[in-house]
Amino acid sequence: MKSVQGKTVLITGAAMGMGRLFAERAIAEKAKAVVLWDLNEAALQRTLEELTGRGTDVTAYLVDVGDLAAVEASAAAVLAEVGAVDVLVNNAGVVRGNQYFWESDSARDTRLTVAVNTLAPMYVARAFLPGMIAGPGEARLLNLASAAGFTANPRMAVYAASKWAVIGWSDSVRLELKQAGVEHVKVTTVCPYYVNTGMFDGAKSAPLLPILEPAHVVDEAWRAMCAGGSFVVLPRTVMLSEVLKGLVPIGVRDFISDNVIGVYHTMEDFTGRVEQQA
């Protein structure tokens, strides 16, 4: 697939940050329709107004993607009002950090993080994948995971767990589609380090792990998605943690991750932008 021209694209967490950039990219490529999902009503309305009138039909839905009933109802509305979705970008996410796990609030922190980061992409994909599979044209599922899904990291235990789960689920769906002989639907899993969207305000860069600019992440993710690529890991030095897991004892890995790569103290000054989409 060279571009999304003529296709219908749905993006979660679309009101700001990378979600909005994905929407702008789809419009620039002359998508037939772009559907924006978000829970921030004011930002969603503002983005809708600013993206309307650029040659693509843009619609917005106020959706709590962590609520299964809300996802199913909104998906039914999209299918009835807009039509089948060709490209689904699971971008919505939250991060709660700067606490040790035992200091966190199970209802406010753990439940929210798992609902939005882990369950939501599954709910949304389940709602639209059957139509993508049944459709005649090329289709894409782009899932935003995180570099945190590859390595343990202090002060973000639940976030890391939520992204580990997304990576396992997303790549398993890729394999299921392949095993089922569905050649026209491709799944791409994107795993960036901290992205400069405001969501990770206060998080530190590390010697081998710079804070990433959202436009760069969106460009790399979009290019891989269109090409049908399986994984995008940014920066590539993130994969050092995977290499270390298989080569050295855990104590040595911890020492290198802490003192050489420098990742274990990156969340100490985290403030974040609570309950905002990525």
Regions from the language model: what does each represent?
Residues 146:
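Residue(s) in the substrate-gating loop at a strand-loop-helix junction
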Residues 125, 162:
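Active-site helix of classical SDR
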Residues 95-111, 155:
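Conserved mid-core segment of classical short-chain dehydrogenase/reductases
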Residues 189, 206-242, 246:
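C-terminal helical subdomain
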Residues 2-35:
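Canonical Rossmann dinucleotide-binding motif of NAD(H)/NADP(H)-dependent dehydrogenases/reductases
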Residues 41-42, 61-74, 107:
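The beta1-alpha1 cofactor-binding region of Rossmann-like NAD(H)/NADP(H)-dependent oxidoreductases
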Residues 31-47:
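Conserved glycine-rich Rossmann-like NAD(P)H-binding loop of the short-chain dehydrogenase/reductase
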